């Protein structure tokens, strides 16, 4: 199996966290998001422990809420020693509603409105990741009006290409996020920030991309950031206390994908950082990482009921399910790969080549193409694996479809964490 929390029981059904997925679909319906809390906690602990053991005191991971965000997630993150990266007032509100400490929230965004800034300040968010000069000015003004000095990190782009998808490559020079180092603009950004009396500049942030499987791109980013930090020390006497290296470690969507050694990569990154600081006689800063996908992706899967089976002679066969791009738009957006398995018939031979399609009125509403399954029948249950990240959070009500429920499994039990939407929910905001 793709991950160790998945298995097949005596009935030939897929299990997750020891629970039968067929039984879960019968109890909670389908489509259904399933999140294995035990795997989630294991992933959190991997990051927390690796950073504590290898990085300076005060280093810890921040969960990237864009990957998955619902109220019941945040108590688990807090219990496991995680901070959280939030990108909107809605994510801030959700985290706080889940009892998450405001001081452990780091507020991102390349276009924070005045209302966003005010809400975050009034919510006592711990740190702002500042993206641009205009935000600096507005944040300084708003903090001053409240009589506070706000902690900030400055987002800079190191010009690193980690060879990932264009849509998730965020560290290159030509990017809407952050201020580029290479052009000299980041140096002016730092000078502007240091002159703001209501802001406390703690260090720098960079995020080079996603689905990165080795430490080397992060080490390259560290080299550039340390050179930049040294230049800022020489120019302004400013020493960065914190380097936030963003997220980006990858996950396995297919059996052919490499296994990512998170502790090994963090250990290699720490060694590289300490060596670079020693060469420059620069105090070793604490390090923050922002894992999202690698915390929740392999803790999640999605269950679907098969509806129609259609073979277009001389072309291909389609298996349609009762969900699609409304609950997982990533194949339509990126041709993102996923492993699809016959959850109710795991022991059957998989000799039927087919494309799994969704129910939306779009020819691009596909989940995966040209995969091997058993000869499918109506009401069979399919599972799409590794959907814990960027499925629930990217879901929509296109075609006025209700969003699925989300169930958390833990210690052999399942509990409803997010209820399924109703038709009444669809018109709740209509006037």
Residue map of PLM features:
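Short acidic, glycine/serine/threonine-rich loops at helix termini
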Residues: 73-74, 97, 117-122, 139-142, ...
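Active-site-proximal loop/turn and secondary-structure-junction residues that shape catalytic pockets
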Residues: 67-69, 90-91, 111-113, 132-134, ...
